[in-house]
Amino acid sequence: MIVVDASALLELLLQTPLGARVEARLFRDEAEFHVPHLVDVEVVQGLRRLVRTGEVSPARAKETIEDLIDLDLHRHSHTDLLRRAWTLRDNISAYDAMYVSLAEALDAPLVTCDGPLATAPGHAARIEVIR
């Protein structure tokens, strides 16, 4: 079981060089991938930003959304994560706190490309940063 955040999924789905390292980590074991429902919105927002800056074409972004929909992800409701996420507010954004809370609840590693998240205090999640 692995929790994957939007930064890692976006790299994976866009098949970037960093995404290749994410893929190697995610698929080295036969693990299930778990995410909060928030991941879909965050990936789409990331794609929007990349399209606006010209880094990704609208057509490629549309394909990536289809790939996201097809990816076998176990999506979790925010309801069970909200209380713990709130306690993390001093050190982690509400968005990141959803992933951290889920990783803690499942006792699973959180795979991310967000380096600062790994050094944020106040949580017990095992965070694996892919660089």
Feature annotation, model-predicted:
Residues M1, V100-R131:
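Acidic, PIN/NYN-like endoribonuclease modules and their adjacent C-terminal/linker elements
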Residues M1-L38, L50-E63, G122:
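Short, well-structured N-terminal submotif of metal-dependent ribonuclease cores
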Residues L9, V39, L81, Y99, ...:
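Alpha-helix capping/helix-boundary segments
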Residues R21, E42, R84, T119-A120:
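Phosphate- and divalent-cation-binding pockets in alpha/beta enzyme and binding domains
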Residues E42-G46, T64-D67, R84:
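A general alpha-helix detector
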Residues Q45-R52, A105:
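Short glycine/serine- and small hydrophobic-enriched flexible loop segments
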Residues L71-C113:
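Active-site neighborhoods of divalent-metal-dependent phosphate/nucleic-acid chemistry enzymes
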